[in-house]
Every structure is written in C-alpha cells, then in structure tokens.
C-alpha cells in the first residue's frame, strides 16, 4: 500500500503495519494495561499494629463510667491506626510483545483510514522557539498534533514543551496512549521506515 507524503511522491509501506484491521478489544486491553502501569501505587497507611505509641490500657475496664478502651491506637481514636490500611501495590498488567505490537499497528492503520496520519519528508525548525513551531503548524493547518521523528530533534522538543496540544517524540518513545490522544499524528518518512522495521 502507499501513503501520501505532503509535497512529495507517495511512499510504499507494508500492509501488515499500516493496513491491519481495527481490533478494538486488543487496543482497549493494551491501553488499559499501559495506563495501569503508569500508576504510582505507593500509598501507605498504618494499621493499629504499626502506629507508634504505648500498648498500655488507658484506664481500667470497669468502674470509671467511661467507655471501655484497651488501646490508644484504636481506629476509632484520634491519631489511631486505619482499619483497612492501604498498602503499596503493583498495578501493572502483563501484555505480551505480540499483543503490544499488534495494538500499535492496529492504531496506525486506523489513523491512516481516518486521514489522521500526516506523512512529511522532514519536520524541523532552525531555532527552539515556540512561536516558530506554532507558525509551522499553522501553515499545515494543525493545532492538535503528535510529531514523530526518527531521532529526537532538540529544537522541536524545546519548542513544543510549552504547547498543551502538541507533543514531540522519537520512534522509540511512541506508545498507544499518545497515538490516540491527538487529532493528527505527523510522521517523517524516516520515522515511517523505522516504525516498519520495529513492528515488522
């Protein structure tokens, strides 16, 4: 199959990478797993056994008129332990390489079908200035875009840092969430070739 390159001849690409059927269930599973893996999972609370303090009974069981109490670390006391204390946990989900690659290829294929994948000969700016990048995107009628280059362009990266709806990645850093998060995905010809090699 062929991809139209802006201002240049069409680029012949692999049908297996850019012409796959849309597999919604697979993409959903991989995106959920990716998001779960990004969770910090480091929350930690103390049970009554872990709270620092004396284990002495505050007052005798009977005869004071007060409610019976055996421990100042009781969950119903101020500064006591937590009844069902949260503990650090790993939220990551296992995704096979074959599934991950399949999801990426399915997303790329769907981007092609929806005319959301824009292939350009090259995408670069001379200075790391946000206004220069904004003007370049404006010339291409783009406002919400992920820019993928073969290797990370420092000028592009610095210029895009202050733009909420623009992100710059190299091929090694693409992921399923970022591919579906933007209206358009701008890819250089060299990046397309790298993607084909990676996901062949």
UniProtKB/Swiss-Prot annotation:
One example GO MF annotation: structural constituent of ribosome
GO cellular component: ribonucleoprotein complex; ribosome
SUPFAM superfamilies: Ribosomal protein L4
InterPro entries: Ribosomal_uL4, Ribosomal_uL4-like, Ribosomal_uL4_dom_sf
Keyword rRNA-binding included in the entry's annotation: yes
Pfam families according to UniProt: Ribosomal_L4
GO process terms (BP): translation
Keyword annotations: Ribonucleoprotein, Ribosomal protein, RNA-binding, rRNA-binding
Similarity section: Belongs to the universal ribosomal protein uL4 family.
Quaternary structure annotation from Swiss-Prot or TrEMBL: Part of the 50S ribosomal subunit.
Function, in words: One of the primary rRNA binding proteins, this protein initially binds near the 5'-end of the 23S rRNA. It is important during the early stages of 50S assembly. It makes multiple contacts with different domains of the 23S rRNA in the assembled 50S subunit and ribosome. Forms part of the polypeptide exit tunnel.
Record-given protein name: Large ribosomal subunit protein uL4
């Amino acid at each position: 199959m062929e991809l139209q390159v802006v201002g240049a001849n069409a680029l012949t690409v692999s049908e297996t990478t850019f012409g796959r059927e849309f597999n919604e269930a697979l993409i959903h599973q991989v995106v959920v797993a990716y998001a779960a893996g990004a969770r910090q999972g480091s929350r930690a609370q103390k049970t009554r056994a872990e709270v620092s303090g004396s284990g002495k009974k505050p007052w005798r069981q009977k005869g004071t008129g007060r409610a019976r109490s055996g421990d100042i670390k009781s969950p119903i006391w101020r500064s006591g332990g937590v009844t069902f204390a949260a503990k650090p946990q790993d939220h990551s989900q296992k995704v096979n390489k074959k599934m991950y690659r399949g999801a990426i290829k399915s997303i790329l294929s769907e981007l092609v079908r929806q005319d959301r994948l824009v292939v350009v000969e090259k995408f670069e700016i001379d200075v790391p200035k946000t206004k220069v990048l904004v003007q370049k995107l404006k010339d291409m009628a783009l406002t919400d875009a992920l820019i993928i280059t073969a290797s990370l362009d420092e000028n592009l990266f610095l210029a895009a840092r202050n733009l909420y709806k623009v992100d710059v990645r190299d091929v090694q850093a693409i992921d399923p969430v970022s591919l579906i998060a933007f209206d358009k995905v701008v890819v250089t010809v060299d990046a397309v070739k790298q993607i084909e090699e990676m996901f062949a």
